[in-house]
From Swiss-Prot:
UniProt gene name: thrS
Catalytically driven reaction(s): tRNA(Thr) + L-threonine + ATP = L-threonyl-tRNA(Thr) + AMP + diphosphate + H(+)
UniProt xrefs under InterPro entries: aa-tRNA-synt_IIb, aa-tRNA-synth_II, aa-tRNA-synth_II/BPL/LPL, Anticodon-bd, Anticodon-bd_dom_sf, Beta-grasp_dom_sf, TGS, TGS-like
Gene Ontology MF annotations: ATP binding; metal ion binding; threonine-tRNA ligase activity; tRNA binding
Organism expressing this protein natively: Anaplasma marginale (strain Florida)
Main location: cytoplasm
Protein name as annotated: Threonine--tRNA ligase
């Protein structure tokens, strides 16, 4: 007999015969939810319900509605789609079919050029396969059998994958009816757990992401635990498409990106206004919270990057140039530069903490296929800062940073923020005592403030734990922006020290921290969060004055001057155009406040006020309208 324990929903234990299946354990220990369980965590490892459990251990259920459960049924759907495509197009060769956020894809090599017109036939075939409700069966094969099987099928992509599996490592396949795929799993017990699915798009993808390899056809899809969940997801995706920051910015003339500078932004005048407002806003917050703003070089000698460790771990993502036979790298991050400023003179413990901030222009050689508007670029500005402090000061610095972070997010209109703590990985440096203290330094401020957080077990960097802060936007999408990362390694590698109270040299802790992440990406998030209708305090044009006729142009110019003197960003449209056309144009440009001026308004020294999103017009004395406007544009 073996003993199985669980902590779900309360700590319990039960005895089972040796080699009991996960399905039997699920039925016995979790009878109320057994029908929705698709897999188990056994001693922290995910496995399917058919796999035997042969020793004492702990289990936790994975339900279909959970994130892990959804990932499993999307994996099922990827296999079902591959089976369907091969049944429709028998010459299909299979490459890879992983899950991704909210979905899955599979890469195919076939003579037929797939298009969205094929989706109906593929989805119908998938539905037929699901209706059979055949089981997913895991088998462990000898390497020779696997090679022979895929050779006979001419599946050269699978053979290439097999060739990279280390000798001695277990090779597993999953059978589904007559369909067999090389796969680690796990899968749900059978196809019926794929309750709702939809194919979404097609793209090209080089095998293994290498442009030297063949271009394959990648079919994307999504799968959910219910038709209602699928419908909700599709609605959100349609809403997200309407909010696409690239389209909105193009319509409004805020920025563009072109092939001659992939991953780099051409900011137009109005977009640059938004950028500078955000930068200045953060600058004021930094000053208030005791940061020193610095500026460091954009390009540094290879030797510094070797010392910092970035050359070894990050070289592929760095842009490297040669000058007088020296290799220089355009900086992908600011931290080594800030250490140079810290160590430019002897520091005393009395100076700590030193909070050093920079709007640092960084560059990373991201793959061209991963670039996406402002969300993933090659050239970007980090709202980056590094706090040099003692171990004893970390807790208070994290507390102060959290207060700053929440002030900023609230001002930008984000109320839902989740926190994750990534703790010590298996491969790490530093003693357990240092890690204990460091993790406590991150947890204690959150506990003191009553902030709930989840733990990403083992996901910290080798040089220290971190907190990640994730925003939820207006349509429920999550965006990880803020970070607090402790670092014991970099100051030591680069020779940073301070003189302690004991008169000896001590290595400071560096806290890497960011609020927005990058300004570019944060602007993209803002555009999509507000669907382009950004708050008046951020709007590049806060007020537009529209004339009904040329007779009131002088009065309109006086109004524009009056608003401009109060630092309102104002534009005057006195063109000889129909007023309805002018209003439609202002609405299209998402101007927060519009003043319409005709003969009547000029005679009474009034304006007719229109707010974006409201079809109503309110007549108001010019002075009162300005006062109301100033209140509106100052609200955060």
């Amino acid at each position: 007999m073996i003993n199985i324990t669980t902590s779900f929903p309360n700590k319990t234990a039960a005895a089972f015969h040796k080699h009991v299946t996960g399905s039997e354990v699920a039925s016995a220990m979790f009878p109320e939810i057994a029908g929705s369980i698709v897999a188990l965590f056994v001693d922290g490892n995910l496995q399917d319900l058919a796999t035997p459990i042969s020793k004492d251990g702990s289990v936790d259920p994975v339900t279909i509605e959970s994130n892990t459960g959804m990932d499993i049924i999307r994996h099922d759907a990827a296999h079902i789609m591959a089976r369907a495509v091969r049944e429709i197009f028998p010459d299909t060769k299979l490459a890879i079919g992983p899950t991704i956020e909210n979905g899955f894809y599979y890469d195919f090599d076939l003579s037929h050029s797939l298009s969205e017109k094929d989706f109906e036939a593929i989805e119908r075939k998938m539905s037929d396969i699901i209706a059979k409700d055949e089981r997913f069966v895991r088998e462990v094969w000898p390497r020779e059998r696997a090679i022979k099987f895929f050779e006979d099928l001419g599946e050269h992509y699978k053979l290439e994958i097999l060739s990279k599996v280390p000798l001695g490592e277990e090779i597993t396949v999953y059978k589904h009816g007559e369909f067999v795929d090389l796969c680690r799993g796990p899968h749900a017990p059978s196809a019926r757990y794929v309750k709702a699915f939809k194919l979404t798009k097609i793209s090209g993808a080089y095998w293994l992401g290498d442009q030297k390899n063949k271009m394959l056809q990648r079919v994307y899809g999504t799968a959910w635990h219910s038709s209602e969940a699928l419908a909700s997801y599709i609605h959100n995706m349609q809403e997200a498409e309407k909010r696409d920051h690239r389209k909105i910015a193009k319509d409004l003339g805020w920025f563009h990106i072109q092939n001659e500078a992939l991953g780099q932004v051409f900011w137009h005048d109005k977009g640059w206004v938004i950028y500078r407002i955000i930068e200045e806003y953060i600058r004021c917050k930094l000053k208030k919270h005791g940061y020193l703003e610095v500026k460091t070089p954009i390009m540094l000698d290879r030797k510094l990057w070797e010392k910092s460790g970035h050359w070894e771990k990050f070289k592929e993502n760095m842009f490297v140039v040669e000058d007088d036979k020296k290799e220089l790298a355009i900086k992908p991050m600011n931290c080594p530069c800030h250490v140079q400023i810290f160590k430019s003179k002897i520091r005393s413990y009395k100076e700590l903490p030193i909070r050093m901030a920079e709007f640092g222009m960084c560059h990373r050689n991201e793959p061209s296929g991963s670039l996406y508007g402002l969300m993933r670029v090659r050239g970007f500005t980090q709202d980056d800062a590094h706090i040099f402090c003692t171990h004893e000061q970390v807790r208070d610095e994290v507390l102060r940073f959290y207060e700053l972070l929440m002030e900023v997010y609230k001002d930008f209109g984000f109320d839902s923020v989740t926190v994750k703590l990534s703790d010590r990985p298996e491969n790490r440096i530093g003693s357990d005592e240092i890690w204990d203290r460091s993790e406590q330094s991150l947890m204690e401020p959150m506990n003191a403030l009553g902030v709930q957080y989840t733990i990403n077990k083992g996901e910290g960097a080798f040089y220290g734990p971190k907190l990640e802060f994730t925003l939820k936007d207006s349509i429920g999408r999550e965006w990880q922006c803020g970070t607090v990362q402790l670092d014991f390694v970099l100051p030591d590698r680069l020779g940073a020290y301070y003189i302690g109270e004991d008169g000896k040299k001590h290595i400071p802790v560096i806290i890497h921290r960011a609020v927005l992440g990058t300004i570019e990406r944060f602007i993209g998030i803002l555009i999509e969060h507000y669907a382009g209708n950004i708050p008046a305090w951020l709007a590049p044009v806060q007020l537009e004055i529209l004339t009904v006729s040329g007779e009131v142009a002088e009065y309109a110019r006086d109004l524009a001057e009056m608003a401009s003197q109060e630092n309102v960003r104002v534009e005057l449209n006195a063109a000889e155009e129909n007023i309805s056309h002018k209003i439609r144009k202002a609405i299209f440009n998402k101007v927060p406040i519009v003043w319409v001026v005709g003969k009547s308004e000029a005679g009474d020294r009034c304006v007719s006020v229109r707010r974006y999103g409201s079809g109503e017009t309110c007549r108001m004395a010019a002075g009162k309208a300005l006062k109301t406007l100033l209140t509106c544009v100052s609200m955060r």
